Regions:
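Radical SAM enzyme [4Fe-4S]-AdoMet core and its adjacent flexible, acidic
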Residues: 1-99
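Flexible mid-to-C-terminal extensions adjoining Fe-S/redox cofactors in radical SAM and related proteins
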Residues: 100-165
Length: 165
């Protein structure tokens, strides 16, 4: 893969590290793992700090992380709903369908998206990427609403792919 690596493959879920260079070509990143037959993915943003505590050039930024997630979502939502499992997308849809995010961190309580965000419960370096996650949640909200409503009607969320054509 272009700079990304499978660091663990457990129960067929591949953990892929997303580096700065990957965020510049999200469609290539998506099609690359799809062509390799990978059907279940956990995306891990690469955050590395130098001795001064600053992000290294290989690290993703919040803005690029958001754009990357949105571009990946666009690939997935148009062709691969229920065919490829991307953990963040699956977890987000589960939250839209009613699963709650208990006890968000104090600094996350004012965020409109804390109920969806897996990082709202813990202090992690990923909180540096809040703006990216917020952009992703905002962008995907209309699609998530439609998929949630399809599921409530005992229909497949895959029907959204046809609606988007």
């Amino acid at each position: 893969m272009t700079g990304s690596q499978v660091i663990d493959a457990e129960e067929d879920r591949h953990k892929l590290v997303v580096e700065y260079k990957d965020t510049l070509q999200p469609a290539d990143f998506y099609h690359n793992f799809k062509q390799r037959g990978i059907r279940s993915v956990q995306l891990i943003p690469h955050l590395e700090f130098d001795e001064l505590g600053d992000l290294t050039p290989a690290s993703v930024t919040a803005e690029l992380w958001g754009k990357f997630l949105i571009a990946l979502f666009e690939c997935w939502v148009r062709a691969d709903i229920s065919r490829i499992s991307i953990e963040l997308f699956d977890a987000t849809l589960q939250k839209w369908c009613g699963s709650e995010n208990p006890h968000p961190r104090r600094d996350c309580q004012a965020c409109d998206w804390h109920r969806l965000c897996p990082h709202a419960r813990e202090e992690t370096p990923d909180s540096m990427l809040c703006a990216g996650y917020q952009a992703f949640y905002s962008y995907t909200a209309p699609h998530m609403r439609v998929m949630r409503d399809l599921i409530k009607q005992h229909r497949s969320p895959m029907e959204l792919m046809t609606m988007l054509r």
